[in-house]
């Protein structure tokens, strides 16, 4: 067979294979054209699931008479005229293929009128060469498209259509997605002459939650957490459902839009899933309705003819931006502050220095052994600093020290060896000590410990606070700063800016790097324990704290930060408790020897044992 140019109708039918998959695809393309025309009201009439009739009527700007024939021609569009337009596309349509493709596999009629015209005009294409016929018609300002007998001339495609109910459900889903994208447009959907959906336009500044509830249901609305997140040219808005109350029905609600265009993007879904993974089960999915706005030059929508895929030029930046935005609202809404005691508490009874836990102790390993899967890698400075010097910087510690030592004097002491210089002992002796063996978790945040037959309770949030303070407290080398992929920019007052400048050297030792200008401060790096925190909340609170101080000591700032960090765990597991105590015993050995108030409490089982024996 010789090479030849395909007839227009056949070429359009081939293109229709990508654009027109089913009746819902036709509805999507035509409704998007109405939105591009500036319509504020769109009426959609469907018969027999779209196989018999699809009628889209809008009140948009309409099409001029001399452009009607071009509207049905392939590769004809009013959206773009150059490559620059394509690279900065903001309209929903731009390929100029939809109407030509649809008209090649159906009987399509286009009726339109502009505000400048006295009468409307109707156009339709027919024949092998798709010749367009234009004639006068009666019609208000706007456009109506009628698609009759879809796939009438392509029986192979028609037989793949599903039942009327299934095809209409696909159309209904498309309209739901479009209605969520454009709250300012009234959309009415009818099937076989009956009104099925009525989505009324929401006035500017009005409550969008009413339409959100009508589309996604009251169950989603009750669990929806609003998101408002911005960085540079990136903006993320919308709602994500509370992961702690996600159900299989809610998990079906996953709507994402990029510059108003509905999308199915793996990168976006992965970022959202990653932000929610700590609160979702292995078989659960997050529920969300999110709107991403990005510079059109930074996203390529010309990936697939159906335009449901995009490519981001800086995909990693977009991924982390979405991840941080979703994680921020989840932490702000769901996490609770650590239970910290402001008042110094009496020191618990002294515990003998030489301890051996029953069974194999995960915490009493040699110093060279790495802890089991720590959440944070401690800064080298914390590990290399002499252990005896760190607790002395904590308020209230010295008051307890005297009492603890008096109690220790009453404890039988082992045989004394010749004294060695004090600085050489702590590191070796500390690692031979342990809080004990973790038996179980009590009340979700306390560890029940056993050592030499003695039982005690340890507060995991308080232990976590002391560990973070150790990780943040600088030693011989400043704490390692972790650059932020998206720097945090905040507006500050003159007093706050002055305090930040005075505290800059102290903050640098803690791994917090910032740059200030006239009225703003930009946080560029933070220490590792702060990376998973909601910096939008923590940093302003830290700035407020610094503004009230006259002296800026790194130790005091580290203590304040540790007390104000959100806990990583709403409910603790055995593995998490074991990992935490391993890190605490390695970095804070003094806590094992002289536990501060609120950390450890002995449990006396003798009365219970005696009562059992007396029965």
UniProtKB/Swiss-Prot annotation:
Gene (UniProt): mutL
Q: Which PROSITE patterns match?
A: DNA_MISMATCH_REPAIR_1 (PS00058)
The positions making up the signal sequence are none
**Which InterPro entries does the entry mention?**
DNA_mismatch_repair_CS (IPR014762), DNA_mismatch_repair_MutL (IPR020667), DNA_mismatch_S5_2-like (IPR013507), HATPase_C_sf (IPR036890), MutL/Mlh/PMS (IPR002099), MutL/Mlh/Pms-like (IPR038973), MutL_C (IPR014790), MutL_C_dimsub (IPR042120)
Q: Does the keyword Nucleotidyltransferase apply?
A: no
Q: Name one GO molecular function term.
A: mismatched DNA binding
| Region Disordered, annotated ranges | 362-397
Q: Where is the composition biased (Low complexity)?
A: 373-391
Instruction: Output the NCBIfam families linked to this UniProt entry.
Output: mutl (TIGR00585), PRK00095.1-1 (NF000948)
The protein in question is named: DNA mismatch repair protein MutL
| Protein purpose | This protein is involved in the repair of mismatches in DNA. It is required for dam-dependent methyl-directed DNA mismatch repair. May act as a 'molecular matchmaker', a protein that promotes the formation of a stable complex between two or more DNA-binding proteins in an ATP-dependent manner without itself being part of a final effector complex.
Q: Which UniProt keywords apply?
A: DNA damage, DNA repair
List the transmembrane segments.
none
Q: Which family does it belong to?
A: Belongs to the DNA mismatch repair MutL/HexB family.
Gene Ontology cellular-component terms listed: mismatch repair complex
Gene Ontology annotations of biological process type? mismatch repair
Under the heading CDD domains, the entry gives: HATPase_MutL-MLH-PMS-like, MutL_Trans_MutL
The record's section on PANTHER family has: DNA MISMATCH REPAIR PROTEIN MLH, PMS, MUTL, DNA MISMATCH REPAIR PROTEIN MLH1
